[in-house]
Amino acid sequence: MTTAAAPSLRFRLPGSWVALDPRDADTAHAHSARIAREIIGPADDAAALRRRVQSGLDDASAAAREASAHLLLMCREIAPGVPTPVAISVHTPVEVTPTVGTAPEAVMRAFTASLPHTAERDLETATRTDAAGSAVLRLHSVTAQLIEEDGSTVTQNRLVARYWYTVPGRKQVALVNMTTPLGDIPHAMLRFFDAIVAASSWSEPVSG
């Protein structure tokens, strides 16, 4: 007896993005460097700013690897001439127990009730929404990162938003993690992230 393949999330992303396997650290690092150059430019006097952007993308790819994400998406630009450093990682669904049935609200209630007993952070930021036929819970944080630049330390604020989707027809939730070094404008970036979630959909597996 074989287990039916799970549906997968699909995103309608604005602009130009690169899809990567987060397990390939060298390729992810090369794309981080390339995107930083495209966003900031190649000028020598912009080297410090390039390092900040690249550091944010490198951190996102490292976090995706550590969390065993199966897909990493890096934004090159959200519109022609509008480069934006954003990374999205998509993670394998996890089981939620105990859950009565597979209705999105039932699964989300069980998942939400379990959170205080887990290592999940930022529960005070919890925001509920619906998207793609799923119940979705958003948690977010803005953290200060210290970056060494030419003998001095610079602080950069990083925004991380974690979206937990219920998986259609299953007692599961799937994590989509969105991050950007543009943490100084969190409200604008959260609106952008929310719009990506609102436009997402589930793709049913193709039967063999």
Where are these regions (language model features)?
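Soluble, non-membrane globular domain cores that form compact, hydrophobic packing
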Residues: T2-P7, P205-S207
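Proline-anchored loop/turn motifs at beta-strand termini and strand-loop-strand connectors
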Residues: P7-D24
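Surface-exposed amphipathic alpha-helical segments
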Residues: W17, L175-G208
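Short acidic, Gly/Pro-enriched loop/turn segments at secondary-structure junctions
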Residues: P22-I35, S207-G208
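Mixed-charge, low-complexity intrinsically disordered segments
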Residues: A30-A60, H140-S141, V154
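Signature of long, low-cysteine stretches enriched in small and polar/charged residues
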Residues: A62-Y163
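Short, well-ordered beta-strand elements
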Residues: A87-H91, Q172-P181
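Active-site-adjacent "gating/activation" loops or surface patches in catalytic cores
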Residues: V167-K171
